[in-house]
């Protein structure tokens, strides 16, 4: 995709959980990248509290296109920003019903990039795309092959449609981050009702 944006000076900021080898891969591709690790924090809370600094860093370094990538581990979360193009990457090998299990990260995306289509049948690809449409009928679905690069040019052209902004301050997420701040979020490891502090949700069993 980067090759399809020759007129732009691009930077990438990756918000990950514990470890990542992406920085080296970006470097090998000639792309400046910074990786941040959420550690024990919620990855999407980590994203929200650092994305303005990431924007300021890229702007200060003279980049004219910033791509931010989150770990994407929590299907409930959606760190998509209103007014900024949002991309959800999902692969065919995750199962044909997976799109129906995803939350705002897929439902509120502008573009859905589907990978690994070369290792499943045409019927599976079509069912997978159909299930994406059920969740997000307005999204632009792109089939991209990460090995051959097929579809990457169209993705690059999509990225060029983004509008220019001077700051992210004051902008809003498209959906709320999880509100469950509980004792386990802050380091508790013991099991038992007496340790269930903060916001919790109990299941009902017959």
What are these regions (language model features)?
Residues 29-30, 82-83, 107-108, 135-137:
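Short, structured coil segments at secondary-structure junctions
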Residues 1-81, 95, 117, 150:
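Nucleotide-state-sensitive switch-loop elements of NTP-binding domains
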Residues 47-53, 153-163, 183-188:
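Short, surface-exposed amphipathic charged segments that create phosphate/polyanion-binding patches used
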Residues 2-7, 166-206:
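P-loop NTP-binding site
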């Amino acid at each position: 995709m980067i090759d399809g944006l020759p007129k732009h000076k691009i930077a990438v900021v990756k918000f990950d959980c514990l470890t990542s080898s992406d920085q080296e891969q970006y470097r090998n591709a000639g792309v400046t990248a910074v990786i941040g690790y959420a550690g024990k924090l919620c990855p999407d809370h980590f994203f929200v509290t650092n994305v303005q600094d990431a924007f300021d860093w890229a702007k200060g370094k003279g980049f004219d296109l910033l791509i931010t990538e989150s770990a994407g581990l929590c299907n409930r979360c959606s760190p998509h920003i209103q007014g900024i193009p949002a991309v959800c990457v999902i692969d065919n090998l995750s199962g044909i019903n997976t799109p129906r299990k995803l939350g705002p990260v897929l439902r509120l995306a502008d573009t859905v990039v589907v990978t690994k289509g070369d290792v499943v049948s045409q019927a599976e690809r079509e069912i997978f795309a159909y299930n994406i449409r059920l969740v997000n009928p307005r999204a632009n679905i792109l089939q991209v092959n990460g090995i051959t690069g097929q579809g990457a040019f169209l993705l690059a052209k999509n990225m060029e449609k983004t509008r220019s902004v001077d700051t992210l301050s004051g902008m809003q997420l498209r959906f709320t981050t999880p509100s469950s701040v509980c004792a386990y979020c802050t380091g508790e490891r013991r099991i038992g009702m007496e340790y269930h502090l903060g916001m919790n949700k109990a299941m009902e069993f017959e």
